[in-house]
Design a protein with these regions (language model features):
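Charged alpha-helical initiation segments
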Residues: 1-58, 70-77, 82, 88
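Helix-loop junctions and short alpha-helical segments
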Residues: 59-60, 72-178
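Beta-strand/loop-dominated core regions that host nucleotide or nucleotide-derived cofactor-binding catalytic loops
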Residues: 245-343
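Charged/polar positions within long, soluble alpha-helices
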Residues: 21, 28, 65-76, 198-205, ...
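Inter-helical turn/loop segments and adjacent helix faces that build the functional surface
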Residues: 206-212
Length: 343
């Protein structure tokens, strides 16, 4: 599952947080210096704050842009583990790919694409279109040139078949908790960061400086947005797996015990192994909707047997009708479905 892009962003944001924490106490520390030093600090402090503000915004947006593009590439890398053929990819990706491949081929002189060779591009295109392998080049979808406002982010991910990003993202933690307290603002802080970055890049006067505490609020918001986006993308990957991967069996719960944390199933001719792969599909109003898990320890008995026949199992090759149950970390309903995979 996706996590590398988020971890790298958190590391970079941590550097910005530490800098602003230090910068906010710097005047107090420096004023304890000599009189001459205090005069120098007082006279130059406005310029220092302007430079600090510009550095913060440029750094923050740079981290965010890097995260968005890294997430797109990581999403494709994870797709390789799910979609083993070109035809298994979303229609939007297949429809856009050739034109974007052509555009990338003409931009290989850009610094960000210099590790990609024409030979590699031709080989990957041949393997994808002729041999039906999933060897798409993620960089084909990284050609917007930056300025990742909310609408640009939406467009970037819509080419991957993810058309409901802006409508759905706010339902994932931690944004859902943030917006429940502050009201939904259409992710406006992201656009504000981009606008401020563009003003600085084009030499506008810094008339509207942000305090270190407000900068840290922006940093915290970017981190929340990134966490929710990563959860959303992982959910989309698991949804794709649900659609195309062939499970051994899809089961549904029939009974619930101990405040719904123990779920019971009734299946015929079932094979169960502790720690076998499971993919849980929740109803539409749950976020995230898909959860990848391992089958926990379970108990089972023949369907017609008495309750005293229930035993603990690590592995079961059950001919005929069987009842089995296991404990979960959350409540299920009869609308939940669980896909079981033997390998």
């Amino acid at each position: 599952m996706m996590q590398d892009s988020l971890l790298e962003l958190k590391k970079l944001l941590g550097t910005i947080k530490l800098h602003n924490t230090c910068f906010s106490v710097l005047p107090t520390v420096l004023k304890s210096s000599t009189v001459n030093d205090k005069d120098f600090i007082t006279n130059s402090w406005t310029n220092e704050r302007i430079f600090n503000y510009r550095s913060n915004i440029i750094s923050l947006y740079g981290c965010f842009e890097q995260f968005i593009e890294s997430s797109i590439k990581e999403y494709f890398n994870e797709l390789l583990k799910i979609c083993h053929s070109f035809t298994e990819l979303d229609e939007s990706i297949r429809r856009e790919y050739i034109d974007r491949w052509k555009t990338l081929h003409g931009r290989l002189h850009f610094n960000k694409f210099q590790t990609i060779t024409p030979t590699f591009m031709v080989k990957s295109l041949y393997n994808s279109l002729v041999k039906d392998k999933n060897e798409i080049i993620a960089e084909c979808f990284l050609q917007n040139g930056g300025n990742y406002k909310i609408e640009e982010i939406r467009k970037s991910f819509s080419t991957l078949g993810l058309t409901n990003l802006n409508e759905t993202l706010r339902n994932y933690e931690p944004l859902v908790s943030y917006y429940s307290q502050n009201g939904f603002d259409n992710y406006s802080k992201i656009d504000e960061i981009v606008d401020r970055r563009n003003e600085i890049a084009h030499g506008a006067n810094a008339d509207d400086l942000l305090s270190e505490s407000i900068v840290l609020d922006y940093v915290d918001y970017v981190e929340m947005y990134a966490e929710s986006l990563t959860s959303y993308l992982n959910d989309q990957l698991l949804e794709h797996k649900w659609k195309i991967a062939n499970p051994y069996r899809i089961i549904k719960p029939i009974n619930f015990y101990t405040r719904n944390s123990v779920v019971e199933f009734h299946e015929k001719d079932i094979i169960l192994r502790e720690k076998m792969d499971m993919l849980v599909k929740k109803p539409k109003d749950y976020f995230p909707r898909y959860v990848r898990e391992k089958l926990p320890p379970f108990r089972a008995k023949k369907a017609q047997a008495s309750l005293s026949a229930i035993k603990n199992y690590n592995e079961l090759y059950g001919d005929g009708d069987w009842m089995f149950s296991f404990q979960t970390n959350y409540k299920m309903t009869t609308k939940f479905r669980i896909a079981l995979y033997l390998s």
